[in-house]
């Protein structure tokens, strides 16, 4: 059977291949090699990790293509890169570079406060963040092949990622329990495409894989998110802002694979050195919360 490259089936299938794995933010080829050796299923190529983006302020944009190309040349695993929300030209540049996935990301400063990228027009698959079922299904309707919780990136605090995965799962359970004649009203209420609401009811899950992201900093955090229903884990600042990145990277991979084995979790949580310095999300002003970007 000949399946055309870039079809919805192919793009979603590529994302399915990452299930159960860890995707790590990297800023150099050396970091990318550490991530690959630790067992990461993919890396996210950036100029700065979210903690540094948050600390630096200003406008955060797509990484320099030269940075991305060097990381792509350094590893054999898939390489992702971020584009600003609504910035379809950045996305086209990333597609031209040959990245394996594009993250239309709230970690970068949005280019458009009203419209997200029409991801159906691209050959490359997209990943997007969501805080609830409606937001997730809107992104899938636009062509996202993979979802992740938004969490609160760059904080080292998993509380918002927990809130978002629980909210999505609660939304799915609600839809499953609705009679068919109430699905259209629910689609209207949460701003989601009706056909995707029907699919959620039938399948009992999102139409695409849903990873945890935003504040995952320890093996225990990764295991927690997996037990709450995530299909895999993104780790941003939590690895290379820690005391022993190589050991922590391996430990988070092991914890994600063995998320319900407490013997393994106790072992991989031991002797990791200092974790990244965290931020209490409650201390952030509303305008400092990256999760509020997009709709």
Swiss-Prot record:
Disulfide bonding pattern of the chain: none
One Pfam family linked to the record: SOR_SNZ
Keyword Iron: no
Swiss-Prot/TrEMBL keywords: Lyase, Pyridoxal phosphate, Schiff base
EC number annotated for this UniProt entry: 4.3.3.6
Annotated positions binding D-ribose 5-phosphate: 25, 154, 215, 236-237
Class of enzymatic activity (EC top level): lyase
A molecular-function term among this protein's GO annotations: pyridoxal 5'-phosphate synthase (glutamine hydrolysing) activity
UniProt entry tagged with the keyword Flavoprotein: no
Cross-referenced SUPFAM superfamilies: Ribulose-phoshate binding barrel
Active-site positions on this chain: 82
Binding site for D-glyceraldehyde 3-phosphate: 166
Catalytic activity of the protein: aldehydo-D-ribose 5-phosphate + D-glyceraldehyde 3-phosphate + L-glutamine = pyridoxal 5'-phosphate + L-glutamate + phosphate + 3 H2O + H(+)
Record's function text: Catalyzes the formation of pyridoxal 5'-phosphate from ribose 5-phosphate (RBP), glyceraldehyde 3-phosphate (G3P) and ammonia. The ammonia is provided by the PdxT subunit. Can also use ribulose 5-phosphate and dihydroxyacetone phosphate as substrates, resulting from enzyme-catalyzed isomerization of RBP and G3P, respectively.
Quaternary assembly: In the presence of PdxT, forms a dodecamer of heterodimers.
Name of this chain's protein: Pyridoxal 5'-phosphate synthase subunit PdxS
The encoding gene: pdxS
């Amino acid at each position: 059977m000949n399946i055309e490259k870039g079809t919805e089936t192919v793009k979603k299938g590529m994302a399915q291949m990452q299930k159960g794995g860890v995707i790590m933010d990297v800023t150099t080829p050396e970091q990318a090699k550490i991530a690959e050796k630790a067992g990461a299923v993919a890396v996210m190529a950036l100029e700065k990790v979210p903690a540094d983006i948050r600390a630096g302020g200003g406008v955060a944009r797509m990484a320099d293509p030269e940075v991305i190309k060097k990381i792509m040349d350094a590893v054999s695993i898939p390489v992702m890169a971020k584009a600003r929300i609504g910035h379809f030209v950045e996305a086209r540049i990333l597609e031209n570079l040959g990245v394996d996935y594009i993250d239309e990301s709230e970690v970068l400063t949005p280019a458009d406060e009203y419209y997200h990228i029409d991801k159906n027009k691209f050959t490359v698959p997209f990943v997007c963040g969501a805080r609830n079922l409606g937001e997730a299904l809107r992104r899938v309707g636009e062509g996202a092949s993979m979802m992740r919780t938004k969490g609160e990136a760059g904080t080292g605090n998993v509380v918002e990622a927990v809130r978002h995965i629980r909210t999505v799962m609660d939304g799915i359970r609600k839809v499953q329990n609705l009679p068919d004649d109430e699905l259209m009203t629910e689609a209207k209420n949460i701003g989601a495409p009706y056909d995707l609401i029907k699919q959620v009811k039938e399948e009992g899950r999102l139409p695409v894989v849903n990873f945890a992201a935003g504040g995952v900093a320890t093996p225990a955090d990764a295991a927690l998110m997996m037990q709450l229903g995530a299909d895999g884990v993104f780790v941003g600042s939590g690895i290379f802002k820690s005391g022993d990145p190589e050991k922590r990277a391996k430990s988070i991979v092991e914890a994600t694979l063995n998320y319900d084995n407490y013997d393994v979790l106790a072992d991989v949580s031991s002797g990791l050195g200092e974790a990244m310095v965290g931020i209490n999300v409650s201390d952030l002003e509303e305008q400092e919360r990256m999760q509020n970007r997009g709709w």
